[in-house]
Amino acid sequence: MMTVSGLTLVSRILGFLRDVLIARFVGTGPVADAFVAAFRFPNMFRRIFGEGAYNAAFVPLFGRKCEEQGSEAAVGFARNTFSALVWAVGILTLVAIPCMHWIMMVVVPGFLPKFEKDLGGIGHGKSFYECRVEVKGAREIYFQITGKSEAAVRHWSARTRVEDMHLLDPEGNKRKLLVSLKDEGFPIVASGQKEIASEGLILTQLSLSGDKHSGVGRDVDPRKRFVPREGEDVLEVIFGIDPTGLARIQLPQDHGMEHFVVQVMVGKVDEGTEIREAVLRIFRNHPENFDLTVALSRIMFCYLFFMALVAHLSGVLNTFRYFAVPAGAPILLNLVMLGSLGLVWFMRWEGDLEVGKSLAWGVALAGCLQFVVLWIACSRAGAAMVPHKPLWNPELKKLLFLMGPGVIAAGIQQVNLLVGGVIASFQQGAISTLYYADRVNQLPLGMIGIALGIVLLPEVTRRLRSGREAEAAHSILRGMELAMLLTLPAAAAMVAVHEPLIQGLFAGEKFSAEDVAKTGWALAGFALGLPGYVLIKVLQPAYFAREDTKRPMIMAGVAVAVNIGCSLLLFRLLLPGGYGHVGIAIATAVSAWVNVVLLWRGMDGFVKIPRSEWQRLLRMALASLLMGAVVYLAGLALESWLSGTVWQRMIALALIVGTGITVYGALVLSLGATSLSALRSSLMADRGREN
């Protein structure tokens, strides 16, 4: 397991660097949401197929072939399966790409343009329009003005006066709120700030022409000055033109507003210009975000084709005990995506859209490279996979029968994240926020849970095939103990210092303090289920080794139902405060623990936990809680460094992590939760499995 964990650690570190740079380039804006939503498909299939589920069906059958009929017959079975995969996934890819628009309507329904108002034609005699815009839970409001002629010119301004809204002053008293739009010109600034003004505030008129960028930041006269009346305050929001040419109102963080009134004026820029008919539409989300998601998904969907084949090749290599190459293949994905970001920097491409497209093409290229590397490794191992017309024989039928429920069962966390993404698409910025939080959560999950699952499945399968059930149960028990020893402190630390971790990793010009807070709380929600995620990886081999994929599938279905119910409930409860996405993270954790309970009860006593193991578990939990308190205090002490330069933040994070490891190590040894000899024997046993 050490080799697998080591290579996975390298991949996770590179993935961290990749995501830190993505956060620096695009933050949590519309392009970030579009890329993350589009990337979810190939990334989900990489985790489901490449990290256990396909192996759950293929490895036991392939392993039995090796044991009973020899490697030559087993390789023949693998080649036939490979050929079937090429045909099946190839057809799926060719069908899905042109149908991506309809697929994304299911995956991210919240990205569909949400018309708040459509004023239709304006400019025929009437020069003043007013409409009420609902903004509850929104981060931005978009205005789109289109004309029937390129010569159409609109001169308009916007202001809001909301009499039934209130803002708490420093003394806690409610005061009426006057909202003003502040022109920042082009390009638009990244985030708005609450500013309570004591004096009059300038309201700027903007001029827009047929050229989507024309006039911005120039035709600002005449200006109107207004003074808040008694009992009113002023809340500024940012108003400008985004890179796609849409007028945008960026609302302050935690604005608490439910609606405001927009006043639109149509007039002449100069005496020689006539007013033409125009159409004004107002959106609660970026009207082009859905189309961008579809375009990026089409580019990256070919990654699914390569990942299905990579999963098959990984299963062959893992059964032959070549763990290193499959475990190291994801490193290529991170390297290529880092190269894509480097290309954006080198070419000095400006705009989030170019970053999103460059990353999408990088993902597609990485899938091809991973396939080539694993195909060469299989060939050198004497198992070259050459596609041919597949034979529809009983072995292939059995594999397909086992693979379906196995994919669902082993991919339960990814199914949960997919469901969460559907719900999160209705909150602006939530999809990218959940992505960044999940990436941090994936570090211990990838190093511990996935590595344990990959190594345990072939080992448990071999021992059950040879009738050594007690040894198989002992392997699972040791895996559970090691999983809890490592994940309990990781979960405690991520809950205790959720915001400092995100601050140190992602904070930047396009990743605001609001983004840090929201991502941090999502990380805390995911961390509550971290031990559960890893236990699922440890317990499932007890079923898959017996070729039982039906019961785990049913259990996974129950967990998904729990996840959907909890996500809908908690999202609705927390959305008014802007934290609906945290409810999705908590629901994912709850569903993971439900799945663990069902898997444990379904084993019918196959693995028994002695009293001494329960005592060690309680000591691990106590050590984790005490360590969590220590790192929380460390985070407070290093708060200024976490807000400093990149190097200061990295040093602060290293100090926090180092303190946590040292304190926890000392506590588990002093409390008797484990011993150095026990750790050494576990690691040596895992190394023996790899060799």
What are these regions (language model features)?
Residues 1-121, 279-691:
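Membrane-embedded alpha-helical bundles of multi-pass transporters/translocases
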Residues 105-137, 151-152, 157, 173, ...:
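Internal, charge-rich low-complexity segments
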Residues 118-125, 177-241, 252:
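Disordered, acidic Ser/Thr/Pro-rich linker "stalks" and the adjacent N-terminal cap
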Residues 127-131, 233-235, 247:
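Short strand-edge motifs at loop-to-beta-strand transitions and within beta-strands
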Residues 134-145, 243-248, 252-263:
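Noncatalytic modules at the cell exterior or secretory-pathway interfaces
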Residues 144-152, 263-269:
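Short beta-strand-plus-loop segments that form exposed binding edges in beta-rich domains
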Residues 150-162, 270-275:
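Extracellular carbohydrate recognition
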Residues 212, 221-232, 243-246, 250-256, ...:
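Intrinsically disordered, low-complexity acidic Ser/Thr-rich regulatory segments
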